[in-house]
Design a protein with these regions (language model features):
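Acidic, metal-ion-coordinating active-site neighborhood of RNase H-like domains
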Residues: 1-208
Length: 208
């Protein structure tokens, strides 16, 4: 924490930049642990690190592929210019963006301080085998549910406006849905979450 906001210590970045490509799953696990400590600052961290995560259990078939090489280089480049995060003022409205990929979801919270968008927290998650088969709309709702579990204190202390073109409001309140969507609707219903079109605010820190 500095006078500018919440910043990553330069030593943390230096350690990762000096890392050589992992040679086995244990070294990948070490890298994953380092990245976990920085997840708050990294947009789409699950997408960026997915090539590494896929190697975590491949002791016999471990191969640092070209995809891993590119992802590792791009990650180091991204870490050279991480955003400064900020804690929102109590009772201020927080805005949220969602990004859905085939194998991951990403979520970012921001708040507006005197007209300036300030990022609060990035959240990202790789889907498990069952979640990969969800419909795109279900994946998007899951992103919000996951964020409430990961960052409950923000959702409890603030109104959160999710900026999206998806019809979340009507779907989550519809009596026609059962199963997981109905369950998610109940989970989200305890928070003050609103849904507005993405054009409602100029996008600067969208996770896409």
């Amino acid at each position: 924490m500095t006078h500018r906001g919440i910043e990553v210590k330069s030593d943390q970045i230096k350690v990762i930049n000096n890392l050589q490509p992992p040679q086995n799953p244990k070294e990948v696990q070490k890298l994953s642990g380092m990245m976990a400590a920085l997840n708050r600052f990294i947009s789409r961290s699950a997408n960026r690190c997915r090539p590494f995560f896929l190697l975590l259990h491949k002791w016999k078939e471990f191969e640092w592929s070209k995809e891993c090489v590119v992802a590792f280089q791009q990650l180091k480049q991204y870490l050279s210019c991480l955003p400064i995060m900020s804690n929102p003022v109590l009772d201020k409205i927080i805005f949220a963006y969602i990004a859905v990929a085939f194998y991951a979801i990403s979520f970012v919270l921001i708040w507006v301080d005197n007209g300036i968008q300030r990022p609060v927290y990035y959240v990202s998650k790789l889907f498990n085998e069952a979640e990969v088969r969800y419909l795109p709309l279900e994946k998007a709702i899951l992103a919000i549910v996951y964020a409430t579990r990961k960052l409950p204190h923000y959702f409890q202390a603030h109104t959160v406006v999710v900026l999206t073109q998806l019809p979340f409001k009507s779907i989550l309140r519809s009596a026609d849905y059962t199963g997981r969507i109905a369950k998610w609707g109940t989970i989200l219903g305890v928070f003050d979450i609103k849904y507005m079109p993405r054009v409602s605010i100029r996008e600067k820190f969208s996770p896409i």
